[in-house]
Design a protein with these regions (language model features):
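Conserved tyrosine-mediated DNA breakage-rejoining catalytic core shared by Y-recombinases
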Residues: 56, 105-157
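N-terminal core-binding DNA-recognition domain of tyrosine site-specific recombinases/integrases
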Residues: 1-47, 62, 84, 173-177, ...
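C-terminal catalytic core of tyrosine-transesterase DNA break-rejoin enzymes
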Residues: 42, 91, 95, 101-102, ...
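Catalytic-site neighborhood detector that most strongly recognizes the C-terminal catalytic loop/helix
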Residues: 67, 124, 152, 177, ...
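Active-site/catalytic core of tyrosine-dependent DNA strand-transfer enzymes
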Residues: 71-74, 123-126, 148-193
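Basic, Lys/Arg- and aromatic-enriched nucleic-acid-binding interface segment
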Residues: 19-23, 27, 42, 46-106, ...
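Hydrophobic face of alpha-helices
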Residues: 30-34, 104, 148, 152, ...
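DNA/chromatin major-groove-contacting recognition/catalytic segments
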Residues: 75-79, 129-135, 235-254
């Protein structure tokens, strides 16, 4: 009952401008409260999660997962050739499947071109007008990604264009808004459908699924638990489902 009263009260609050809070914001606040109760259940003996029992508030509609095929991405990136920094940023996003904040926190020290690896151990945020580097989203997000040869070559070329670069300097001193505008420019110039920056991550996962990699292997690369990959992208595993059905046919026949 207390949680429901809290929900009703917060719905009545407004911003300093007089506007009501958006459904997405309300849902995010409720989710954070629910996480606190889940923590109390796990570590402090709380019996139930009252936030979960009360139900969510705000938007219940999750944003549709969109992704590009490899052919669509190649059309898009070809249109970005005239904007080098954005070009290389999108190359990393698509071929490595990292998060936007992880991309914007990258430094030269994160690249090992001899081993052809990229280390992910931090994230970038803009808070109260300041650039802030934080720890990654989850413990699983700390990872080392193997880069394909062509991407190693591209990034070494890019580093040569960055004069006076220090080991701890951000190699993409961009804002999230600049990335979004770059995406809009590339989509318009190439004629491919508009997707969100985060959908490049979905596109990377989709590509790996189509290449035949397991949920465990993909999860390790993108910083997700394999169960999350299976849950989020189950509809993209049609060949696996067909293989299961074929093997069940064999088992039944035997």
């Amino acid at each position: 009952r207390d949680v429901i009263d809290w929900q009703n009260e917060i719905r009545q609050h407004t911003k300093s401008s007089g506007e009501s809070y958006s459904p997405d914001y309300l849902k995010n606040v409720h989710t954070q409260l629910s996480c606190i109760f889940n923590h109390a259940i796990k570590y402090y003996g709380l019996q139930i999660n009252p936030a979960a029992k009360a139900g969510n508030m705000g938007s219940e509609q999750s944003k549709e997962m969109l992704f590009w095929t490899k052919e669509e991405y190649l059309k898009f990136i070809d249109a970005m050739m005239a904007k080098p920094m954005l070009y290389y940023a999108f190359e990393i996003l698509y071929w490595c499947g990292i998060r936007e904040g992880e991309l914007l926190a990258l430094t030269p020290a994160d690249f090992d071109f001899e081993k052809k690896t990229l280390r992910i151990n931090k994230s970038y945020q803009r808070l109260q007008g300041k650039d802030v580097i934080t720890t990654p989203k989850t413990k699983k997000s700390n990872r080392v990604i193997q880069m394909p040869d062509f991407l190693c070559d591209e990034m070494q070329d890019y580093f040569k264009q960055l004069y006076g670069l220090e080991p701890d300097s951000r190699i993409f001193p961009l804002s999230k808004y600049a990335l979004k505008r770059g995406m809009e420019f590339g989509c318009k110039a190439s004629g491919v459908k508009v997707i969100r920056i985060h959908d490049l991550r979905h596109s990377h996962v989709s590509l790996l699924i189509n290449m035949g990699y397991s949920a465990v292997a993909i999860g390790n690369r993108v910083g997700h638990e394999s169960v999350e990959i299976t849950y989020r992208y189950a509809h993209l595993f049609p060949t696996v489902q067909k293989e299961m059905a074929d093997k069940l046919n064999v088992e039944r026949s035997n």
